[in-house]
Amino acid sequence: MHFSKLSLASLKIAAPLAVALAVSSCAFKHTKYENPITVQTQQPDKILYDKAIHDLEKGRYEIARITLNTLMNTYDSSEYMAKAKLAVADAWYREGGARGRAQAEADYKDFILFYPTMQEAAESQEKLCMIHYQQMDKPDRDPNEALRAEQECRQVLTQFPNSKFAPEAEQRLRDVQEILADAEMRVGDFYHQRGSFASAANRLGGAVDQYPLYSRADEALWLEGDSYTRLGPRFRQQAGDTYARLVRDYPLSDFADQAKSRLKTLEMPIPAPDPAAEARMRFEKENRTKPGMFHRLTGFIRQNPDTNVAAKSGTPQMNPPKQSIPVTVPVPGSQAGFQGDVTVTPVADPSALENKPDARQQPQAAKPKP
């Protein structure tokens, strides 16, 4: 009887305990797991990233790059991997200098290669454009940086046409092409003044064909037409076509009336002005920034070119320049037949080439006595 009372008492104590354990077990299974790293603290990769950005904003570029490289080497699967890679390029870009620009260019290109679909890829391409845009020289200097800027700005528009950087890159491309066109214009004008009219027509025509938004395209056409006129009647058609293009595509030009007079002299029709071209020229004249007196006086000491006169509207040239053929070079045979007295006589007996002795092995004939 004593044993039965003890067992009954034990069961009364054990039953509630078992129920409590079962309930607590179920509650533990459905309780949300708390990551101890995210409770009142930050992820270590984020700590490194925030520290690097703080150093970057304070101008401590070398320290920022060391921290960012530590992040990328330690946490290669971090969500901040792409941002860290871009921040390294930005650190080089802000540091500047020849070394900084070269390193930034390489890092931006790597970022676009590894993350082409990210929004920051368009920003990286825009920075590539700016690296060379800021290093452009004047039109009479080395055009290498301007050509590189043209290439990188084009890439923004072709690879990221819908990005927020596209409108700004388009205007920069117009600025760059203004400088490149002005360089060609200066060379063509030099040839024209020296009387080398064939070279002048080639240079001036190529400048307008490649950069129709050039602020002095009308003057270039006028000099091109004048060069053809001075080359003689043989180039009458080319001169007339050039004057007609000036009247049609640049109707508000100061040279339009002179071009019409030349067309009358050549007895060629005067075309009607293009309404779209007229509207564009009117817009450019109203919105073109005119340099002040101080700007003109200090122009000779400035290293960077003046882009105030660059077009503010219109689609810039998106194709690379084509190699133009000077007007004095004969047209290839596929476009015009060759005229000459050269004749070809076929070999009647092909075996004669093998049977006859080699003339090079025969003794040289004696020279006649004087």
Regions found by a protein language model. Name each.
Residues H2-I13, A22-P370:
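Acidic, polar-rich low-complexity tracts and alpha-helical solenoid repeat scaffolds
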